[in-house]
Amino acid sequence: MRRKLVTGVAAASMAVLSQAPAHAQEPGVKADIDGDGRADPVSLRQVSDDQMLLRAGLSEEFTDAVVQGNARGLPLIPVDVDGDGTDEVMVPESVGANTVIYTTWRYTPEAGLHPVRTADGKPLGLAEGGGARALSTYGCTPAPDARLLVAVNAFATPDDSAFEGERVTYSVRDGIATLVTSAPVQGAGRDDPQLQADPATCAPLD
């Protein structure tokens, strides 16, 4: 069946593609972003120093979105942060020396590809990494008929004796991440359970 490009972003995508360097990478993954039970190819292409093109190949069309940032060759990560059986993808938008900042992108027929946002309308950013004096990670925990998304961010105290920060839990529904709990972390060692979360627990459901 002949595929078509979703027209809502076609012009912007073509403009971005026209600026793409010849060496731009396009790492791809498979994720069932439309919930039809079939894995869709999803790719990320670096088209300039600060812009990327996110593309998904659905059964009858391609859909694109322009994403600000630079993945520096890191791949997309398929996830299902709400446990509804329809996948999302984590997009590495900012890559530092020790930490990667991800945003979570989803698809709907009405809005195409778009980021999961917090209740105030901002894209939800999740950090992974940290280095010797910081710790950031995320994961998912089971909830009745769903999953909850957990984000952990902490920094070493001035004397390096412990970590302080917060552990935040979100409920993601219809692309909106609603705050459930925000628990302060104080006097915790790096191995403290309050600082633990496993990104693998957000993997797509079998």
Pin down the residues of each PLM region.
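Acidic, small-residue rich beta-repeat scaffolds with periodic aromatic anchors
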Residues: 2-5, 23-33, 124-206
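Mid-chain, structured segments of secreted extracytoplasmic proteins
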Residues: 64-95, 101
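Structural recognition of the beta-propeller blade-terminating site
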Residues: 58, 105-106, 171
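Terminal domain-start segments
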Residues: 2-5, 11, 15-73, 193-206
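Structural motif
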Residues: 50-53, 97-104, 157-169
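Blade-edge motifs of beta-propeller repeat domains
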Residues: 54-72, 114-130, 181-191
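Long, charged/polar, surface-exposed segments that mediate recognition or autoinhibition
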Residues: 88-119
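Acidic/hydrophobic-patterned starts of short beta strands in beta-sheet-rich repeat architectures
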Residues: 35-45, 81-93, 143-152
